[in-house]
A protein has these predicted regions:
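Auxiliary, metal-adjacent structural segments of Zn-dependent hydrolase domains
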Residues: 7-10, 14-77, 126
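Acidic-and-aromatic substrate-binding clefts and catalytic sites of carbohydrate-active enzymes
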Residues: 83-84, 105-108
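Active-site recognition of the HExxH zinc-binding catalytic motif
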Residues: 91-103
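Post-HExxH zinc-binding segment in Zn-dependent metallohydrolases
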Residues: 107-126
Length: 126
């Protein structure tokens, strides 16, 4: 499978997988965030993994959610079978992306800020 970071042009990844347009949109939002909301200079990259067949994920603190950013791995995990469809997936990716940016900036995690950012990205992207 082609990974988003393998693309030189920053375009959404065209992956043919069961004919799903959703696959392109999933990686498209990651590409969009990488291009328009990068981390501060000197920060590493974050990996985004979509967990097929999951409708929720347990975070390191034991709480359940649709996605989680794990700082020790610099990785975002997103449940792939979310209620609410595409908009919910985009908001979840953006929410966790914001937590990653907060981490990169040594800021405390702010749920309200992450939710506002998620809604903003959904409006921009859809």
């Amino acid at each position: 499978m082609v990974q988003p970071e393998d693309r030189e042009d920053g375009a959404a990844v065209d992956v043919i997988l069961k004919g799903k347009r959703q696959m392109k949109r999933k990686y498209g939002v990651v590409d969009y965030l990488r291009k328009h909301y990068p981390p501060p200079e000197g920060s590493g990259e974050v990996e985004v993994e979509f967990l097929e067949g999951y409708d929720s994920i347990e975070g390191p603190d034991g709480s359940m959610g649709f996605g989680v950013f794990v700082p020790t791995e610099e990785k975002i995990y997103i449940a792939d079978d979310l209620p609410g469809g595409e908009e919910s997936m985009i908001e979840t990716v953006a929410h966790e992306w914001k937590h990653w940016l907060q981490y990169c900036n040594d800021e405390a995690y702010d749920e309200e800020e992450a939710e506002d950012f998620a809604r903003q990205i959904a409006e921009e992207f859809l």
